[in-house]
């Protein structure tokens, strides 16, 4: 006998146009809007953190608002360039070599968080040195707000019907337009919840309740560990990229491989921050 859960599990995902609206030749897409909204909300939240002197050691924020505003463009460049280059290198090098023009077609999707993290980290290092900003404190401010962008990015992935999960019969499983006739885990929403909402709340608790910004590098380490743990967990429900597949057995994915060193770096950053604080 068919149950409500079974009927829910075979509901097709409504095919949503990736283009929200057009203005002449300009097409506004969900993917691009997610990046813009995520960056702007993250910038707004970062300004509030920097303005709150009580969160900082000796009441001195890592940077002033003018410097933070200037960094916005650097951050956007690091995210987009690093994310795209990372995706090409980690996930789609063969296809790009066959059709090099695909490398610049960002509007069709294809961004790597790990690549974006590397790009943004390089942007922060250069910007901090140019402006005499304590690098670990700048890392901490950015780390505290990154989950906002992750949340909106994963919601855009869901709307676009991309990066879907593995086959599933859970009541909330979804039949995606490009995922075949079978229901799948909405793994984009799992990531939006864990990497976005949950991680944002955890970091906010450390920032506001534990005053973690007074220990440079601690928030960064917590973010990196939290993201790595969330990503590795969700990878068990997410379908691997078709052009790569599983790296070993039917479980090891590129996302897991890239997240393991992240977790180790996060643990090191936390240990380093605590050691430096104890020695101060």
From Swiss-Prot:
**One GO molecular-function annotation for this sequence?**
phosphatidylglycerol-prolipoprotein diacylglyceryl transferase activity
Q: Where are the transmembrane segments?
A: 30-50, 71-91, 106-126, 132-152, 188-208, 217-237, 251-271
According to its UniProt entry, one GO biological process term is: lipoprotein biosynthetic process
Q: Name one GO cellular component term.
A: plasma membrane
Q: How does it sit in the membrane?
A: Multi-pass membrane protein
Q: What is its EC number?
A: 2.5.1.145
State the superkingdom.
Answer: Bacteria
Q: Does the keyword Chloroplast apply?
A: no
Cell membrane listed as a keyword: yes
InterPro entries (UniProt xref)? Lgt (IPR001640)
| Enzyme class per UniProt | transferase
Q: Which UniProt keywords apply?
A: Cell inner membrane, Cell membrane, Membrane, Transferase, Transmembrane, Transmembrane helix
* Pathway this chain belongs to: Protein modification; lipoprotein biosynthesis (diacylglyceryl transfer)
Report residues binding a 1,2-diacyl-sn-glycero-3-phospho-(1'-sn-glycerol).
Answer: 154
Query: Sorted alphabetically, which PROSITE patterns does this protein's record hold?
Result: LGT
| A Pfam family reported for this protein in Swiss-Prot or TrEMBL | LGT
Q: Which family does it belong to?
A: Belongs to the Lgt family.
Q: What does this protein's UniProt record list under function?
A: Catalyzes the transfer of the diacylglyceryl group from phosphatidylglycerol to the sulfhydryl group of the N-terminal cysteine of a prolipoprotein, the first step in the formation of mature lipoproteins.
- Which protein are we looking at? Phosphatidylglycerol--prolipoprotein diacylglyceryl transferase
